[in-house]
């Protein structure tokens, strides 16, 4: 085991954990940090490196499960119904939100992998996603009628699901597109963020699990320590990032993240081209 390469795995896990759920594009950051600096393909090989990125994403997913564990127990009916008969987020909201991107993702997975994963397309996604986020903040109603995730309607859930389709374009950012969509239909930034993270777990787990099954044969026993280090690094930093972001989003909204995305796109452009 090479300790320097183990540290690279930890750093990549950190980058994944910090950026997966923020509206800044984890793909864009992985391009800048991995492709231009750490180069995981050099010590893992191309296919094992791709599998490694799937594994560290699973670490981020586990962090979201931990943060929202009570909510998931409610959705699954383990904790019983919410007392008082008040409106409550349920599985139908989540399913409605998942369907559009889930269907398109299954139909066009191979096309997206073959034709849309390039530095140029990620740069386009970074900029277009930033413009959407700026527009969402500009045109959002000053007083959001949906303050909490439990007040979300089925129509709002479906619109957020439609907006999630934009995240199939690499670099667009799942949370950037869905939080923007939620804000545009009258949700508070916090309600939109909560729904985004809850909805992200099943769709990310499904996509990552499928990719892992397809590519696991490329992993050797020597790679396992790097995978474990990256997984736990992503888990820890995602845990911190999710909690921090949820406290921050209602205060600063989306524009600062949009500006950051544009700066990131410019930096990647000058480093890569």
Curated annotation (Swiss-Prot):
Keywords attached to this entry: Antibiotic resistance, Cell membrane, Cell shape, Cell wall biogenesis/degradation, Hydrolase, Membrane, Peptidoglycan synthesis, Transmembrane, Transmembrane helix
Subcellular locations according to the entry: Cell membrane
InterPro entries: UppP
Gene Ontology molecular function: undecaprenyl-diphosphatase activity
One GO CC annotation: plasma membrane
Transmembrane spans: 4-24, 48-68, 89-109, 116-136, 152-172, 193-213, 222-242, 252-272
Principal place of residence: membrane
Recorded coiled-coil stretches: none
Entry EC number(s): 3.6.1.27
Membrane topology, as annotated: Multi-pass membrane protein
Catalysed reactions, semicolon-separated: di-trans,octa-cis-undecaprenyl diphosphate + H2O = di-trans,octa-cis-undecaprenyl phosphate + phosphate + H(+)
Enzyme class at the top of the EC tree: hydrolase
Keyword Zinc: no
Pfam families: BacA (PF02673)
GO biological process, one term: regulation of cell shape
Purpose: Catalyzes the dephosphorylation of undecaprenyl diphosphate (UPP). Confers resistance to bacitracin.
Other remarks on this protein: Bacitracin is thought to be involved in the inhibition of peptidoglycan synthesis by sequestering undecaprenyl diphosphate, thereby reducing the pool of lipid carrier available.
UniProt record similarity statement: Belongs to the UppP family.
NCBIfam families (UniProt xref): PRK00281.1-4 (NF001390), undec_PP_bacA (TIGR00753)
Name of this protein: Undecaprenyl-diphosphatase
Protein species of origin: Geobacillus kaustophilus (strain HTA426)
Lineage start: Bacteria, Bacillati, Bacillota, Bacilli, Bacillales
């Amino acid at each position: 085991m090479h300790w320097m390469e183990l540290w690279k795995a930890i750093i990549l896990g950190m980058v994944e954990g910090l950026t997966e759920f923020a509206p800044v594009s984890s793909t864009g950051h992985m391009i800048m940090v991995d492709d231009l600096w750490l180069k995981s393909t050099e010590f893992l090989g191309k296919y094992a490196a791709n599998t490694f990125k799937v594994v560290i994403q699973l670490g981020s997913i586990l962090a979201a499960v931990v943060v929202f564990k009570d909510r998931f127990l409610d959705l699954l009916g383990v904790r019983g119904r919410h007392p008082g008969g008040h409106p409550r987020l349920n599985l139908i909201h989540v399913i409605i939100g998942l369907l559009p991107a889930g269907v398109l993702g299954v139909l066009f997975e191979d096309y997206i992998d073959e034709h849309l994963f390039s530095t140029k397309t990620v740069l386009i996604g970074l900029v277009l996603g930033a413009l959407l986020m700026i527009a969402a903040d500009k045109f959002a109603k000053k007083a959001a009628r949906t303050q909490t995730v439990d007040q979300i309607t089925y129509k709002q859930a479906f619109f957020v699901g439609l907006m999630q389709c934009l995240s199939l374009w690499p670099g667009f950012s799942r949370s950037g597109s869905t939080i923007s969509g939620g804000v545009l239909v009258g949700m508070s930034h916090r309600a939109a963020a909560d729904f985004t993270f809850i909805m992200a777990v099943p769709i990310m787990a499904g996509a990552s699990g499928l990719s892992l099954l397809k590519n696991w044969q490329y992993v050797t026993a020597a790679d396992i320590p790097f995978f474990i280090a990256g997984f736990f690094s992503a888990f820890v930093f995602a845990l911190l990032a999710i909690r921090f972001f949820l406290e921050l989003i209602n205060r600063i909204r989306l524009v600062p993240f949009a500006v950051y995305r544009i700066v990131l796109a410019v930096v990647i452009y000058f480093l890569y081209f």
